[in-house]
Amino acid sequence: RILLQEHSRFLHRYSVSDKGGCGYLMEKYYLAVDIGASSGRHILGHMENGKIELEEIYRFENGMDHKDGKLLWDVNRLFGEILNGMKKCKELGKLPVSMAIDTWAVDYVLLDEKDQILGDTYGYRDHRTDGMDAEVAKILPETELYARTGIQKQIFNTIYQLMAVEKKTPEIMKQAKTLLMLPDYFGFRLTGNKLSEYTNGSTTQL
């Protein structure tokens, strides 16, 4: 569930000037952005005397928004919090050489041909997936699905979320060009690179 990203764009936008002296730091720092369902934090790590030293530099609250009976994630706010923590690195004069973004599993965004998010970004606790397991089973029996993926059936798995999109808002599915899991989406916003990190991708049951 961890997506490693090179930080070239981060350095371009938030680098400290050489006059400040921070450009000559020899210490190598690595940034982990750990986002959970109720909070997120930025952790800087570095090696000191042969040991890994960890430092929490930024923390923020998280949670699903209730809107028109739906449970949704505000991905723009979350991305803003990621940037806030990165700016904190600049304030501390501790620029990471690389970073990773980690969130919960199964939730995703669909992007159109212009890389804009289609529809709402649902949270895994939303009930739109109720009954979608039966719809998937009409196409692929549960035993065969498990044989292919080896993933435990959970009604919030991405496969059932996508079936809900197909059944309830098919126009969104027709416009969709890319699916990105949430950590991969944030990484895309930072780097411009689209990819699917294997371990998080395995939680989709796809």
Could you tell me what each predicted segment is?
Residues D126:
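Carbohydrate-associated surface elements
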